[in-house]
Design a protein with these regions (language model features):
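Hydrophobic alpha-helical transmembrane segments of multipass integral membrane proteins
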Residues: 38, 74, 81-82, 89, ...
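Juxtamembrane transmembrane-helix termini
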Residues: 5-18, 77-111, 119-136, 318, ...
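Alpha-helical transmembrane segments in multi-pass integral membrane proteins
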Residues: 11-30, 37, 41-70, 91-99, ...
């Protein structure tokens, strides 16, 4: 994927200009690319098994460290995506002392998320209809409309395609989680600008979540997901303190890298507190500006970060297409899917995502001006 991104990036001046845009948190661009790649690799193994044996699960032959690693890559990527979201928006609360116009905020979020989402679910519907038509228009609408709900509703099968959710690798539930976070942001904003500040808000959310988890009010996975956003908030708080200058140094980078690899390789379950601790410390380092010896500044990885939303929503379609093109084993299958995915996602970014992003940016001062004012 990195090689393909590098080749395509050289021929797309628009993509390169976006990658090179000044950023307050440049290392996060590369991290997004890493997360998208991790989710893709994880689902490649799952989809390969699905299209070869009919079961959505990791390769049956994988076990031990290799099996754990492949099995946990996806959850690691998703946890980091949640942390990035928590960090960016709580950092905004800290820097700008809240959000002045919540109506405008939600409109921008909708314009950022909805266009590509609606395009992808429409393509999914067309693919599923190719396998068989529903009994009539009303039946089709009954099947299709829940897919427009950003993951809030159970996804019924469309047309003749059994387990239609596998066409998107079941990722839509995470969008519902993100929207729930957006809905509680006004409360978080009040806490962030209160006397206690962001640190108190993060501490209160952690204590409340852990207490609810141990009382059985929320399940372990849900608690870990909530804490991912809290880790993002903690990183935003740390970014404004002297700890930032410690976490962005190479010794912390080495400790974080080893801890992350150990947690992903030795953990038998996803979304657990061990993984949260390791992934959380890794993220604290990245958010503090640690590029991990420049790896997160690698331009192809930043290109993948630029198109990470497209990769996240579209990789299931690429995996389905690749299953029709090759049966030469997992690695050839994965490479085939990547060769389809990255160019396709660059196109969806340029022609679906970017126009709406550019429209939102036109209403804001240039980033260079924002950086000078901080």
């Amino acid at each position: 994927m990195l090689v393909i991104a590098w080749l395509l990036g050289r021929f797309s001046t628009l993509a390169i200009s976006d990658v090179e845009r000044p950023s307050r948190h440049g290392a996060l661009d590369g991290l997004r690319g890493l997360c998208a790649t991790a989710v893709f690799i994880h689902h490649s193994a799952m989809a390969f098994t699905l299209y070869s044996s009919g079961k959505w699960r990791p390769l049956a032959g994988l076990g031990g460290l290799e099996g754990n690693f492949m099995g946990n890559l996806g959850s690691m990527g998703v946890m980091l995506f949640f942390m990035i979201t928590g960090f960016l928006f709580i950092d905004r609360m800290i820097v700008k002392k809240g959000i002045e116009d919540w109506g405008q905020f939600y409109r921008k979020r909708l314009l950022r998320i909805a266009p590509l989402y609606l395009f992808v679910v429409s393509v999914v519907a067309l693919v599923c209809l190719a396998y068989g038509l529903p009994s009539g228009p009303l039946e089709f609408l009954k099947q299709y409309i829940p897919w427009l709900g950003f993951g809030f509703f159970r996804l019924p099968d469309i047309g003749g395609y059994s387990s239609s959710w596998t066409v998107v690798c079941g990722v839509l539930w995470t969008l519902a989680i993100e929207w729930k976070f957006y809905f509680v942001l006004p409360v978080i904003g009040v806490l962030c600008i209160s006397r206690g500040g962001a640190g108190s808000a993060v501490a209160a959310s952690v204590v409340a979540t852990v207490a609810l988890s141990y009382s059985g009010s929320i399940e372990g996975k849900s608690a870990v997901i909530v804490l991912c956003f809290a880790v993002g908030g903690l990183a935003a708080y740390v970014f404004e303190t002297k700890w930032r200058d410690i976490l962005n140094k190479w010794p912390c980078g080495i400790v974080a890298s080893v801890g992350l690899f150990a947690a992903v390789s030795y953990s038998f379950t996803s979304y657990n507190y061990l993984s949260l601790t390791a992934v959380g410390f890794f993220f604290l380092c990245v958010a503090s500006g640690n590029s991990f010896f420049g790896s997160l500044s690698f331009k192809p990885l930043k290109v993948l970060g630029l198109i990470s939303y497209s990769i996240y929503l579209c990789h299931g379609l690429a995996l389905l297409a690749a299953s029709k093109m090759t049966d030469d084993g997992l690695y050839v299958y994965g490479l085939t899917a990547a060769a389809l995915l990255v160019p396709g996602c660059l196109l969806t970014y340029l022609y679906i995502e970017r126009p709406f992003i550019s429209g939102m940016r036109s209403a804001q001062p240039p980033m260079s001006a924002q950086l000078k004012s901080q």
